[in-house]
C-alpha cells in the first residue's frame, strides 16, 4: 500500500526513462558485486580444501544457482549450489565449511559496516575530540567480532581444515569482497537518491552503506522471505525515513529492488553463457 500511496512506481518508471544512464551504471555495479561474491566463495572453498587448486568453475556455478534465492524458503540457492558442486567433485566437508564461512563472514561484514555507519551518525552529535574514539571503537568492535567468529568456526566445523594459512587467506579475501559488496550497495543507493530520485541532499555513502548492510542482513535471516523481498524494502524505507521524506525513501527502496533483481537476472544470464561456452 505504501508503494501505491507514495506513487513510488510512477516515480521509478519516470526516473528510468529520464536517467537511463544512472540505472545502467548501478546495475553494472551490482552485477560486478555479485560476481565478486561468487569469486569470494571460490576462495573460501580453496581455503578449506587441502591440496585443491583455486577453481574458476565455482564462480560460474555460484552465479547460476544464486537465482534460486527468489524461490520460496530463500535457501534453495544454497542447496542447489552444494548439489552441483558436489557432482563436480568437491567434498561435502569443503562445501559445508565454505558455506558456513560465507554466511558468517557476510553477516560480520554487514555488522561491522553497520556499526561504522552508526558511529558516523553518532559522531555528528559529538565534539570533534570525541569523534575519532567513537569511530575507532566501532572498528575495533567489528574486528573483535570477526576474530571471535573465526575461532567459533574453527572449533565447530571440521577443526583441522580451518587451522591453515589457506583458510585464513581465503577468509581474508572473502570478507574484503563482502565489505566491498556492501559499500557498492551504498554507492548504488546514493546514485539512485541523488541522480534518479533527485533528492537534494541524500545521506552520505557511509550511512547508506550501513543501511544497505542492515536491510540485507534482516532480509537474509528472515525465514521464508524469497531474496528478502518485502523485508529489505521495509527496513530500508524505515532507515531512509530518518534522512529523507517518505515518498523518496519508498521510491529509492523500489528502485533498489528493481536494480538488484535485474542485476541478478543479468548475472545469471552471463554465467549461463559462460557455462554453455565451456561445454
Question: Each PLM stretch: what is its role?
Answer:
Residues 75-88, 224-241:
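Re-entrant/interfacial helical elements at transmembrane boundaries that shape
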Residues 55-60, 74-79, 86-103, 244-255:
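Membrane-interface alpha-helices at helix entry/exit sites of multi-pass transporters
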Residues 83-84, 97, 106-109, 113:
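A broadly conserved amphipathic alpha-helix scaffold signal in soluble, globular proteins
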Residues 1-63, 110-112, 116-222, 239, ...:
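Predominantly cytoplasmic-facing regulatory/coupling regions of multi-pass membrane proteins
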Amino acid at each position: 500500500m505504501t508503494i501505491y500511496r507514495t506513487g513510488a512506481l510512477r516515480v521509478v518508471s519516470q526516473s528510468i526513462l529520464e536517467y537511463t544512464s544512472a540505472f545502467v551504471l548501478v546495475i553494472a555495479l551490482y552485477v560486478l558485486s555479485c560476481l565478486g561474491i561468487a569469486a569470494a566463495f571460490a576462495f573460501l572453498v580453496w581455503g578449506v580444501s587441502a591440496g585443491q587448486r583455486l577453481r574458476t568453475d565455482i564462480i560460474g556455478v555460484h552465479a547460476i544457482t544464486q537465482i534460486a534465492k527468489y524461490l520460496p524458503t530463500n535457501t534453495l540457492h544454497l542447496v542447489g549450489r552444494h548439489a552441483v558442486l558436489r557432482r563436480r567433485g568437491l567434498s561435502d566437508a569443503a562445501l559445508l565449511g565454505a558455506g558456513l564461512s560465507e554466511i558468517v563472514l557476510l553477516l560480520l561484514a554487514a555488522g561491522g559496516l553497520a556499526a561504522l555507519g552508526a558511529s558516523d551518525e553518532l559522531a555528528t552529535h559529538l565534539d570533534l575530540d570525541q569523534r575519532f574514539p567513537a569511530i575507532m571503537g566501532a572498528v575495533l568492535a567489528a574486528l573483535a567480532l570477526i576474530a571471535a567468529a573465526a575461532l567459533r568456526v574453527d572449533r565447530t566445523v571440521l577443526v583441522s581444515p580451518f587451522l591453515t594459512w589457506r583458510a585464513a587467506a581465503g577468509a581474508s579475501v572473502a570478507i574484503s569482497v563482502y565489505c566491498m559488496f556492501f559499500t557498492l550497495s551504498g554507492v548504488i543507493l546514493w546514485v539512485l537518491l541523488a541522480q534518479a530520485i533527485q533528492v537534494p541532499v541524500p545521506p552520505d555513502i557511509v550511512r547508506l552503506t550501513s543501511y544497505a548492510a542492515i536491510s540485507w542482513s534482516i532480509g537474509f535471516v528472515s525465514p521464508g522471505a524469497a531474496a528478502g523481498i518485502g523485508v529489505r524494502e521495509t527496513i530500508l524505507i524505515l532507515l531512509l525515513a530518518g534522512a529523507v521524506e517518505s515518498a523518496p525513501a519508498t521510491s529509492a527502496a523500489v528502485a533498489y529492488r528493481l536494480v538488484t533483481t535485474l542485476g541478478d537476472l543479468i548475472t545469471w544470464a552471463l554465467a549461463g553463457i559462460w557455462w554453455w561456452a565451456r561445454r
